[in-house]
């Protein structure tokens, strides 16, 4: 019985255990269900400082995709569990995370993120808070440049900054272009003169010129030589107040490029690569006639009727039936049409004398140009840091194919930059920044300097192929340049630039008083080689024609060596003066030394081996050697004091005392001061009512002067060039020289004085920003040619500080940026638009005859003179009647041709009954009037950026509103 009872007991216990387990599971399910239950949680989001509600703030349940936004009154409602965490985000505020903790009402207080306004901006020899700026400075984040698929940083800057204009003369990746900030700089100005029915381009020297100063980590450099992926920020100093601390070097504005350094305390390796396919916007091959017969008929119709006029109707072609070519077996057009009718597309035939006769269908642009070409970029970056050491190494390889289908057309670059900083003690740090840039460019070229378009247009005709059936070159193949490119005519450029800066920083009082000293050395080694090879055209199997002969051939080489050294010592004092006072004082010394050497060698009349080691080994008949050297130095003492009171009233003065060896001893030094004031109205007590929507409202004004010493090192010296006579005497060329142009002993700096007023404003937690400036710039003591000397003197007019110029302009920038929740990720977007305009006038020029084709007092830079019109003549009868009534007998363009239908109706401005140019002066310019200006007006740039979940899209538009 005990045994049986034991079994029953056991069964009972097992049943109870199973029941317990089931009950436990049910309780767990109930508990889980209760835990997972989402309840409505509501609350109000307010601003910590103003206690105002924040509308449009994003509320998310952390770790989920559940979210909502606040209503106009700042309220919200969201489904959340008792233990969930709410994440609240809004542009211009710090992100807040709040535990629900079982509450049904959760209010959230957002704290303003002052990073946008308090961010530091790179300025000359230091940094300032954005709120302390009173000059015209625009700062760009490096990410704005890396998003653009350009090999050259200068192209990426185009349209990003109001007042910054980068002029590109072509689309080559190697060309940086000329960088202008706020309008025309003094330089060589081209005008187009027209007299007696002929046109002539003339260039007049007007000032020293020079592009904006580009400093890469404090060392003068080229934007085309910096890796876009390695840029931390770019600051553009546009007015005299901002650039005065750079003195003469900053006369045309300053661009400060700061490269990236190591961040954090971990070792990172990153790689990025891209491939870009470029397609020509204009496809010439689609716009020309490539059918040989059609081209011939069109050409001959024009050719046959080129002398046709209503007065000479016998010259008007009635039919295109014949075209005789010397040596052709019969009429060329007849032969062409017969071949086409028979389906014979063989382009080769023969004349009776055995020379070739061609019947091709050649698309010459398709031979010369690729429909598209590619480029690739590879970036590798290594960065790391510890408590005492920071290091980074960044490299880039860029390879771009050229546009041409033939010859060697390429551009390759390699960038490498290393940065190391060691904290030796708590008051001493040392650093080194070394960069290397190497480039190689190959390009086809004509020895005559003509463009491919000129040569191809004249000699690349549809019926004429570039090569004969046996592979030799045709006459068109040679004269178009095709043969030269295929045989090795070309130009090859190499560039190696190494820059190294070593510096030390002593913190006497941390974050208060520090001394920075550095020394930089830059070596530039450039080489250019050019070749012209003998080329022969075969007019027939036994009829060679040497186009470029053995005697015409040459190989040449240029080497350009530049060594640059600079030293800087900068003392910075930023004392802690309490909440109501901010003081930033900078003082320093700068020394620069430039040395330049050029060597040129050319060997003519040689047979080229495929590879050559030295010019001495060439089998040549003539050798030419040239060399020249130059050097100059600059030294400057500078200072800046920036003070703000109550974070409302800002005052700044800066100055530089510059010395340059380019000027005579008595004129080598110049003093260039500036002063600025700013007023932050938003910080005034009576503006508290605007705190909820106005973040910054600053008006500013400044004036300052800068010197421009961008002249050649020996301009102040009267030099005598030695040349050789072109006509030999006694069987040899002799040396000769000419009388030098006199140089005034008072030759000195050009001085640029700028006046600027501006407004900066930020609204809605810096989502909406506006900046505007109006400026007036006076350039005095411009170096240019003086009054003409008597012919008996035998030399050109001397150069001196004779002229002056005025530039006026304005610029505005408006931007909007925001972030909204899209799914579980932020969707960030920004829109930025810039518009600017500038005009320049010659306020004084030492000319007395008022020639409108030259510079004169009152001339607007870029102005164009021409005839004005009043439509076209609709018929020959109207043209003849008009000519008879007004006494106009001839066409202005060609005195031998009467006025005809389609000719322009020129307006007789001076009413003398004829169309003429007068004497081409301001007093007598006939019927000429100012009809336009070549200076770009109303330049604009629009930037659109979007990003979401690691996916980005950037769009950029730029243009000219008027020209």
What are these regions (language model features)?
Residues 1-401, 405-416, 429-431, 826, ...:
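Short, small/polar-rich motifs associated with maturation and membrane association
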Residues 4, 279-280, 368-369, 691-695, ...:
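C-terminal beta-signal and adjacent terminal beta-strands/loops
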Residues 23, 381-383, 423, 828-830, ...:
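Conserved C-terminal beta-signal and adjacent last beta-strands/turns
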Residues 149, 218, 237-240, 249-253, ...:
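Short, glycine/acidic-rich beta->alpha junctions
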Residues 154-160, 797-806, 850-864, 925-945, ...:
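C-terminal extracellular loops and terminal segments
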Residues 210-211, 419-438, 446, 472-532, ...:
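Extracellular/periplasmic, surface-exposed regions of secreted and cell-surface proteins
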Residues 270-354, 600, 819-932:
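Conserved small-residue
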Residues 460, 483, 538, 619, ...:
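Extracytoplasmic gating/loop element in the C-terminal half of outer-membrane beta-barrel translocons
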